[in-house]
Design a protein with these regions (language model features):
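Short, small-residue alpha-helix embedded
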Residues: 89-98
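Activation-segment/catalytic-loop signature of the eukaryotic protein kinase fold
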Residues: 1-89
């Protein structure tokens, strides 16, 4: 979400605590996160950036379904790192730059990166998320209106 003051909203939550219901809640939460990333990317791209690739790190990279979701919901290619500990590798890149081993962070990244597996967005699948994204934006607008009442 490209609004640092936004709060989370869950719509349609029921008292059903069955396994299937919890799976649906988990999936819709993941979709919400992916749409939040899409919102941030759109804000950046509207302000002069041209982001079309996401380099992801962390535990969620172990879930191919989430990586597919991020690609399809954002329309960006997703690069999953080959490094086992990509976050630590990134920290090492910053440290190597600070220690003067590289002239800048970009040079450290180019020299130390270990590549990754690139997953392309599926445009046909992405259009399924357009409706969800319109709902996402409308819920954000409504949440802002509620905040103004306070």
């Amino acid at each position: 979400m490209a609004d640092p003051h936004a709060v989370g909203v869950v719509s349609g939550l029921t008292l059903d605590s069955s396994f299937d219901s919890l799976c649906k809640l988990y999936w819709r939460t993941a979709v919400g996160i992916a749409l939040g990333v899409r919102h941030v990317l759109e804000a950046l791209n509207e302000n002069g950036y041209l982001i079309d690739t996401l380099h992801v790190t962390g535990g969620h990279t172990k879930n191919p379904l989430l990586m597919e979701l991020y690609a399809d919901a954002t329309g960006c290619a997703v690069v999953e790192p080959l490094a086992d500990e990509a976050v630590l590798l990134g920290t090492g890149m910053v440290a190597a730059t600070a220690a003067g081993l590289f002239p800048d962070l970009n040079a450290a990244c180019v020299a130390m990166q270990q590549g990754g597996k690139k997953r392309a967005a599926n445009p046909a699948a992405g259009t399924r998320f357009d409706r969800d994204y319109r709902i996402f934006l409308e819920m954000h607008r409504q949440r802002q209106a509620l905040d103004e009442i306070r």
